[in-house]
Amino acid sequence: MKEIKTLEEYNALGKEPSIIEFGTPDTCIPCKYTKENLEKFEQNKKFNLTFYQCSDINIITSLEYSSVPVVVLVTPNTKVELTDSSISMDEEELSNWIEQNIGD
């Protein structure tokens, strides 16, 4: 995964479908599971997506995320987020979520 280091880098996303993972703590088991599934999708090139991560607290708070982790899917037409309890998805659920939102 590529690291987003500035807010400008984040704001430039969206021309190509992308997934951004914000602040996934390894101590959160469901979050870690989702992170592992995203990494698997990236390695297997399951989706035509660019994968990013961001752990910079200044960027996270400037985007008004009050809790992490957050997974964001950005396309030229939409931005959808997984937060809080929705972050815990198995591989099939996460795959379905991406498929439902990538073509919008």
Question: PLM features: what roles do these ranges have?
Answer:
Residues 1-5, 51-55:
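Short gly/ser/thr-rich secondary-structure transition/capping motifs
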Residues 2-41:
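Local sequence-structure signature of Cys/Sec-based thiol-disulfide redox active-site neighborhoods
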Residues 8, 57-58, 92:
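Acidic phosphotransfer microenvironment of two-component signaling modules
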Residues 10-12, 61-64:
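Short amphipathic alpha-helix with an adjacent loop that forms part of the alpha/beta core around
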Residues 24-26, 54-61:
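Structural microenvironment flanking redox-active thiols in thiol-disulfide oxidoreductases
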Residues 46-51, 64:
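Acidic, low-complexity, intrinsically disordered interaction modules
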Residues 63-74:
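Structural micro-motif
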Residues 73-104:
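Non-catalytic, surface beta->alpha helical segment in thiol-disulfide oxidoreductase systems
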